[in-house]
């Protein structure tokens, strides 16, 4: 209302409002999540939390996966938190429950919960590897080999290779394949499914 008064130069300008009566908390949160994204830009975090409050089963499932690793969902990167919530949603929708679960587990185990390991490109890169190679990707070997490298090295190599998460997946695969008798073929990363 203040913005309209400022623009029109009058506090007497009529403003169209929608008033809801007798809403339960969950329904109000659902209206907020779905209407506000068209009115003002909301962060992925705001939309996610509103959908959780609305009781949306998909968002509750994603939240339970994240919290099962003693992580909090936050808007900013901190220790013990995941702030790349839109990436978690993306992985869950595109690849499913188990890939999101394994992705988070692998990132935490490989880099001992470093908050920089739970950023968008790392999460998507690990998910791409899990989808492309499935059971051929030995998770214990991944943790051992990739964990020996700092995240800075992985990020530097990824930026030199390709844009986005594919570069991160390529960088991690190159480290994983070092000194392997039968390395995983990089061509599988470019499959349409991953």
Sequence positions of predicted segments:
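Solvent-exposed functional surfaces
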Residues: 10-194
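A sequence-level detector for short glycine-anchored, His/Arg-bearing signature motifs
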Residues: 1-11
């Amino acid at each position: 209302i203040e913005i309209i008064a400022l623009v029109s130069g009058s506090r007497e300008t009529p403003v169209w409002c929608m008033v809801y009566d007798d809403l339960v908390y969950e329904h109000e949160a659902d209206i907020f999540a779905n209407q506000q994204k068209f009115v003002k830009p909301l962060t992925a975090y705001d939309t996610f939390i509103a959908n959780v409050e609305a009781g949306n089963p998909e968002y509750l499932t994603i939240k339970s996966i994240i919290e099962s690793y003693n992580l909090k969902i936050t808007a900013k990167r901190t220790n013990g938190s995941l702030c790349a919530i839109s990436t978690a949603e993306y992985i869950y929708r595109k690849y499913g429950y188990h890939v999101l679960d394994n992705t988070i587990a692998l990132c935490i185990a490989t880099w001992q919960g470093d908050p920089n390991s739970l950023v968008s490109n790392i999460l998507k890169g690990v998910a791409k590897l899990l989808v492309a190679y499935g059971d051929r990707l030995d998770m214990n070997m991944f943790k051992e080999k990739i964990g020996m490298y700092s995240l800075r090295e992985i990020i530097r190599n990824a930026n030199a290779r390709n844009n986005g998460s594919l570069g991160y997946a390529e960088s991690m695969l190159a480290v994983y394949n070092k000194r392997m008798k039968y390395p995983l073929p990089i061509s599988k990363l470019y499959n349409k499914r991953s």
